[in-house]
C-alpha cells in the first residue's frame, strides 16, 4: 500500500480512512442492535465492497426493508466480481478499522467480534447524498447480517467460499 501522500487524488478521496471507518461503524452499530455480541470480523470485510459499490448500494437502497437473501437472489449481478472487490478493498477496510481503533470507537471482544463504543460517533448522517447513502446502506447490511446470523450463509450468498 502506498503512503498517503503518494496515492492518486481520487483514491485519497474515495477511500479516505475516516469515511471508510464511518461506513464500517454504521454497519457494526446496526449489527449490535440485533445481536449485542458484535459483528464477526469475517463479516465486516464485506461491508465496504457492498456499500461503496454504486450498483450494490442502489439495489439495497431501493428496497431497504427487503430481506438481503431475497434481494441478492433477484439481483445476481451483485455477485459479479464481488470476491475480487473484497480482496481489493481489504487494505482500505484495515485502514478504516485502524482509525476506529486508534480513536477508541471500537473494541475487539475475546471471541473476535467487533463491538462499537457508545457516544464516540455522531448518530446523525451528514455529507453529500452519496456519502449519506453509503451510511444508510451500511446500516441495512449490518442489520441483515445479524438477522441471517450465519457467516457461511452470508458468504455463500455472495458467491464467496468461506
Predicted stretch roles:
Residues 94-106:
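Basic amphipathic alpha-helical segments that dock to polyanions
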Residues 109-110:
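Beta-hairpin "wing" of winged helix-turn-helix
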Residues 113-118:
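Minor-groove-contacting beta-hairpin "wing" of winged helix-turn-helix DNA-binding domains
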Residues 27-31, 50-54, 100, 145-148:
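Generic structural signal for hydrophobic core residues of well-folded globular domains
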Residues 70-92:
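Helix-adjacent hinge/juxtasegments
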Amino acid at each position: 500500500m502506498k503512503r498517503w501522500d503518494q496515492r492518486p487524488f481520487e483514491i485519497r478521496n474515495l477511500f479516505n480512512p475516516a469515511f471508510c471507518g464511518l461506513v464500517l461503524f454504521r454497519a457494526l452499530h446496526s449489527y449490535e442492535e440485533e445481536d449485542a455480541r458484535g459483528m464477526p470480523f469475517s463479516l465486516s470485510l464485506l461491508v465496504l465492497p457492498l456499500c461503496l459499490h454504486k450498483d450494490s448500494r442502489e439495489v439495497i437502497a431501493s428496497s431497504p426493508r427487503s430481506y438481503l437473501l431475497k434481494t441478492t437472489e433477484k439481483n445476481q449481478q451483485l455477485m459479479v466480481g464481488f470476491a475480487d472487490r473484497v480482496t481489493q478493498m481489504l487494505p482500505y477496510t484495515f485502514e478504516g478499522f485502524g482509525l476506529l481503533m486508534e480513536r477508541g470507537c471500537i473494541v475487539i471482544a475475546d471471541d473476535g467480534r467487533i463491538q462499537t463504543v457508545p457516544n464516540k460517533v455522531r448518530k446523525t448522517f451528514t455529507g453529500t447524498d452519496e456519502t449519506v447513502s453509503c451510511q444508510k446502506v451500511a446500516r441495512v447490511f449490518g442489520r441483515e447480517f445479524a438477522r441471517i446470523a450465519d457467516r457461511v450463509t452470508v458468504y455463500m450468498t455472495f458467491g464467496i467460499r468461506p
